[in-house]
Amino acid sequence: MNSLSTSTVTPVAFSLGLLLVMATAFPTPLPLGEDETTSNGPLLTTADKTKQHIKYILGKISALKNEMCNNFSKCENSKEVLAENNLNLPKMAEKDGCFQSGFNQETCLMKITTGLSEFQIYLEYLQNEFKGEKENIKTMQISTKVLVQILMQKMKNPEVTTPDPTAKSSLLAKLHSQNEWLKNTTTHLILRSLEDFLQFSLRAVRIM
């Protein structure tokens, strides 16, 4: 039987394996040389680790937004300009059960997992179009998939609707056909919308 050479393991494949492990054991910021068993603080709960994972993704988004601002002069745009790019990005609404008023855990978890799954096509677009550190986008894409799997474990009836392949191909073709200005605006809007969605998700996880 042929053995697998370590030289065939790509950085992305390594990241995928590492992030899948995070689904059951999240990394948490502890002082060098300490772990959860040696730290004087209390052990982190599953909810705490979920929050840390969301914050990890938010950190990646912040880094990408800063990179766009510093390297491509694409900083915070006005809402009016962003609104011109009428993407159907997932958003939180009162009916989704994620707000403190009218909170419903099962409904909220369904919204978060479905919304993050819908964001995958836009992250795929970023992976192809972003003119910067693509490894950060790949890591963020994998991390959101891991987060979906984690949250599905908390659901009574874990079902996530996936985008239709034909509709997905059509949307990607439409996004890729845009001019350079619209591509940059779309990239910024996707990052900002995912950031907003995760911020709402983080608040919801805190009251679960």
From Swiss-Prot:
Function in brief: Cytokine with a wide variety of biological functions in immunity, tissue regeneration, and metabolism. Binds to IL6R, then the complex associates to the signaling subunit IL6ST/gp130 to trigger the intracellular IL6-signaling pathway. The interaction with the membrane-bound IL6R and IL6ST stimulates 'classic signaling', whereas the binding of IL6 and soluble IL6R to IL6ST stimulates 'trans-signaling'. Alternatively, 'cluster signaling' occurs when membrane-bound IL6:IL6R complexes on transmitter cells activate IL6ST receptors on neighboring receiver cells. IL6 is a potent inducer of the acute phase response. Rapid production of IL6 contributes to host defense during infection and tissue injury, but excessive IL6 synthesis is involved in disease pathology. In the innate immune response, is synthesized by myeloid cells, such as macrophages and dendritic cells, upon recognition of pathogens through toll-like receptors (TLRs) at the site of infection or tissue injury. In the adaptive immune response, is required for the differentiation of B cells into immunoglobulin-secreting cells.
Residues with attached carbohydrate: N71, N184
Recorded GO MF terms: cytokine activity; growth factor activity; interleukin-6 receptor binding
PROSITE patterns tied to this protein: INTERLEUKIN_6
Residue list for modification Phosphoserine: S78
GO biological-process terms attached to the record: acute-phase response; glucose homeostasis; hepatocyte proliferation; interleukin-6-mediated signaling pathway; liver regeneration; positive regulation of cell population proliferation; positive regulation of multicellular organismal process; positive regulation of receptor signaling pathway via JAK-STAT
Main location: secreted
Coiled coil segments of this chain: none
Subcellular location: Secreted
Disulfide bonds listed in the record: C69-C75, C98-C108
Entry protein name: Interleukin-6
The species this protein was found in: Equus caballus
Pfam family, one: IL6
Keyword Phosphoprotein: yes
Signal peptide: 1-27
Assembly: Component of a hexamer of two molecules each of IL6, IL6R and IL6ST; first binds to IL6R to associate with the signaling subunit IL6ST. Interacts with IL6R (via the N-terminal ectodomain); this interaction may be affected by IL6R-binding with SORL1, hence decreasing IL6 cis signaling. Interacts with SORL1 (via the N-terminal ectodomain); this interaction leads to IL6 internalization and lysosomal degradation. May form a trimeric complex with the soluble SORL1 ectodomain and soluble IL6R receptor; this interaction might stabilize circulating IL6, hence promoting IL6 trans signaling.
Keyword Metal-binding listed: no
